[in-house]
Amino acid sequence: MSLEPQNNLLANINTNSENLPENDVPMSITEHLEELRQRTVFVFIFFLLAATISFTQIKIIVEIFQAPAIGIKFLQLAPGEYFFSSIKIAIYCGIVATTPFGVYQVILYILPGLTNKERKVILPILIGSIVLFIVGGIFAYFVLAPAALNFLISYGADIVEPLWSFEQYFDFILLLLFSTGLAFEIPIIQLLLGISGTVSASQMLLAWRYIIIISTIIGAVLTPSTDPVTQIIMSSAVLALYFSGVIILFLLRK
């Protein structure tokens, strides 16, 4: 009987054992569910604390969000509009503050079950997604929001006086920040497609004509305002993010 199949089997076992995480302790389904429940409770408590703190500091947060709207007077058009808008803003701030902590809990939950090779891929992607979302929000606040507001304020300023609803303005700002943060996740999606072998970097580069059209559509859909300036800036950012993802995949040889 040939020993070659047995040697191949032993080699595969040794290779797989090297990829397994250290101190891997088996857990029952009940233990997994209990750990998941505990981490979910931790995230929920953290969210409540973050939202509560945000509500107590709502005046400072409102002033920060109002900063891009220079020279605009905000009106309360309905009873309790400011109060209910403050609750909404506090909830959104709580979600944003909780997201990194939630991702951290997800990492702690899935980490013991990952091989060393999977850890090298998944952990940077999770951390990178948080960083890119935050960068997208900062880009929206310092670039997109001022550009959109300046256009909307200056257009027809000699005819009508800009008096804006407090609630509608903050819906506009929050939607702009959130949608831009999502748009900045494009390189993460490209990395997942490239690493999984679904689409290569060369194929992504060859599709540049279609990407220009798609980026224009994304810029029109994700920007809550209809002004061309904001849409052009958003489309340009989407293109830059896309080609950045292609360059990263080329560097990774995917």
UniProtKB/Swiss-Prot annotation:
Annotated Gene Ontology cellular component terms: chloroplast membrane; TAT protein transport complex
Transmembrane segments: 41-61, 64-84, 91-111, 125-145, 146-166, 172-192, 204-224, 232-252
UniProt keyword Secreted, yes or no: no
Main localization (coarse): plastid
Membrane topology, from the record: Multi-pass membrane protein
A molecular function (GO) term: proton motive force dependent protein transmembrane transporter activity
GO biological process: intracellular protein transmembrane transport; protein transport by the Tat complex
PANTHER family in alphabetical order: SEC-INDEPENDENT PROTEIN TRANSLOCASE PROTEIN TATC, SEC-INDEPENDENT PROTEIN TRANSLOCASE PROTEIN TATC, CHLOROPLASTIC-RELATED
Name of the featured protein: Uncharacterized tatC-like protein ycf43
